[in-house]
């Protein structure tokens, strides 16, 4: 069942003793109890032991508070995620994706703020763009074109986010009686009519589920494709060599007897 939007009331603070950092920290504590959706300014005031006007002095509305929470959450997330390195791009990108997923899966509040709410302040958006730039630059150094490096990192990001958000929505649906919560719950799997699906699902595979098996398979597909692009690029002659070869061919043709 969903947690009821109540909070333990602390001893009331003295007037003027609260600051923005305390409010943000308290909001994270309260969100762990009641969820981001049920977080409210009056409830936060009770949790912190202050009048709600003390909160409104710093954050005029809930969205302002959530933006500040997102900034803090994103900075922690960025520092917790390993970098993509050019000299070992495949394994470092794999580890980057795995830890990204693990971080969000282990922290529903982080998932709700960054992935589901997806409203980044200019500061948070700038920080996120800088981290993506670094990852893409290292993929270019590893041998991908800028376009392929961008598409590869974007595909990994979408793959991670899709897996995490689907898992988070599944968790939320578990608290309400909303019928089938996964695709396989709604699909009638009958060995007589769907023998292949029945065979594979009996071995533990799940249809469209954001589980480890499906995540790793999709990640392997993205990395394998990037590897083929790098291999293809390494075999292509460099532009400078192509230009030299073209000039040599022109000279040879001009010097040939007619």
Segments (PLM) and residue ranges:
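Amphipathic alpha-helical interaction segments
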Residues: 22, 64, 95, 130, ...
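Helix-turn-helix
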Residues: 22, 26-64, 68
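Short, basic, alpha-helical segments at the C-terminal edge of helix-turn-helix-like DNA-binding modules
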Residues: 72-78
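A hydrophobic membrane-anchoring alpha-helix module
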Residues: 212-233
């Amino acid at each position: 069942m969903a947690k009821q939007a109540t909070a333990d009331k602390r001893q009331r603070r003295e007037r003027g003793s609260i600051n923005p950092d305390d409010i943000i920290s308290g909001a994270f504590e309260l969100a762990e109890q009641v969820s981001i959706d049920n977080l409210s300014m009056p409830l936060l005031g009770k949790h912190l032991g202050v009048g709600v006007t003390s909160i409104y002095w710093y954050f005029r509305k809930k969205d302002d508070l959530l933006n500040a929470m997102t900034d803090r959450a994103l900075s922690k997330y960025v520092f917790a995620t390993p970098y993509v390195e050019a000299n070992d791009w495949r394994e470092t990108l794999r580890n980057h994706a795995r830890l990204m997923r693990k971080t969000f899966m282990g922290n529903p509040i982080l998932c709700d703020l960054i992935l589901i709410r997806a409203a980044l302040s200019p500061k948070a958006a700038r920080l996120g763009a800088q981290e993506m730039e670094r990852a893409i630059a290292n993929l270019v150094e590893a041998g991908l074109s800028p376009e392929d490096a961008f598409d590869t990192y974007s595909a990994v990001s979408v793959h991670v986010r899709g897996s995490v958000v689907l898992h988070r929505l599944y968790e939320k649906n578990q608290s309400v009686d909303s019928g089938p919560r996964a695709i396989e719950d709604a699909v009638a799997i009958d060995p007589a009519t769907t023998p292949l699906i029945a065979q594979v699902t009996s071995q533990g595979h799940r249809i469209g589920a954001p589980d480890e098996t499906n995540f790793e398979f999709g990640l392997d597909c993205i990395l394998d494709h990037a590897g083929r692009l790098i291999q293809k690029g390494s075999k292509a002659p460099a532009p400078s060599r192509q230009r030299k070869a073209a000039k040599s061919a022109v000279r040879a043709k001009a010097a040939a007897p007619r």
